[in-house]
Amino acid sequence: KTITEYVSRYCTDGVLEYVIATHADQDHIAGFVGTSAAKGIFEAFECRTIIDFARTSKDTQLYKKYVEKRDAAVAASETVHYTALDCWNNANGAQRSYELAPDITLNFLYQKFYEEEAKDENNYSVCFLLKQGNNNYLFTGDLEKEGEKSLVEKNDLPQCKLFKAGHHGSKTSSNDELLAKIRPEIVCVCCCCGSTEYTNDIANVFPTQDFCDRVIKYTDKIYVTTMYSETAEGNFESLNGNIIVSSNGGEVKVTCSGSNEPFTKSEWYLKYRAGNKAA
């Protein structure tokens, strides 16, 4: 419901020309499926082109429901479905590059786990680059170190205005080899900052110390969606909130529903990340 309501603010005709599911982990496909109480993206909108992952090791009920809803959308309308590998190969009607508007293109990138077996589901992530004139915006899903290495080797990556941080700011993503190539000016992280859901080690809660140490060498314009809170409903509250990166083709602007100050100026960052170094 949260996702469909947010998208509806901008998609006023009920049609999404392109939707991308990066990989089959729950937090990346649940919004497409929906629940008994609320429609997911595949049912709430007409999705003209669905592009997703070429491989997965998942066999969960959620993944099966994702496939069911995706295929139902294709069967019921003029919707087409391709994998990222189809796009890279210009195969089965897919394209490596799609023109979204004059001087704006959606470009699919190659990484070896489109075709090879990965030890971690994250490395099956779809990777793509939005180009708007001379501005570049990179999205890598939850791609991790080995996948990022392949991404750098197999593509001529440009300097990027925006990098949507890999795997929620984990220590296994957004590695030096990739960052040195793209030299990002703005980095956005989708995570609940400071949450101990996965670890009690403060250095490894999202966004991790390793991640911050690597990114700060290129930019202090880091933005993070939410912050852990023991007292807030659901145990989280807005940090930067909804992060909107916009441009008319020249200057790139960041507007947030929460604080407009970069994460690097937050009390949490100054207390737990600034001046500290990963062991």
Q: Where do the PLM segments sit?
A:
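Active-site metal-binding loops of divalent metal-dependent hydrolases
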Residues: 1, 22-24, 55, 112, ...
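Charged helix-capping and loop-helix junction motifs
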Residues: 34-38, 123, 204-208
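Short, solvent-exposed loop/turn and secondary-structure capping segments
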Residues: 30-34, 62-64, 141, 175-176
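Internal alpha/beta domain cores that form substrate/cofactor-binding pockets in large enzymes
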Residues: 58-63, 69, 73-80, 151, ...
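Active-site metal-binding motif and surrounding structural segment of the metallo-beta-lactamase
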Residues: 1-52, 153-170, 183-188
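Core dinuclear metal-dependent hydrolase active-site scaffold
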Residues: 1-15, 83-162, 234-279
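Hydrophobic/aromatic beta-strand patches that form the interior of the parallel beta-sheet core
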Residues: 20, 49-51, 83-86, 107-109, ...
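Divalent cation-coordinating acidic motifs and surrounding scaffolds
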Residues: 20-22, 28, 53-65, 76, ...
